[in-house]
């Protein structure tokens, strides 16, 4: 789609245009980063098999980064710093964060039911920390869909998510 995305972003910047990207805490099972995350144990696990908990948010299988695991958070922050901030992005949509599986196994044995509302806060914190660690605090705008008490101090903008739901269109 963009054979030289950093070059394209630089060209846009020269024209006074900002570039926003997209991220979420799911990784496609076909993505190269998935293999690394699986090898390091950075995904929420299936309680029965201990393998990554595979689900689908759209049309393809994905695993969810276990944001209860400090090492997984550090890994994903570094991905954001390298692959988004490092190529010149000016911000992004930090999507999802609300789909913590209630039957998954979390790092440290934490209860998914108790962590359900904390997960969006952890997602917002991860994004905020990536921006701060990169030294770009006031230059970057990112926005989250999911939130809970404490999220607003971690994210510059919140959006209400997708407002079209088939139940209400009939």
Regions found by a protein language model. Give the residues of each.
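Catalytic-domain carbohydrate-binding cleft regions of carbohydrate-active enzymes
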Residues: 1-170
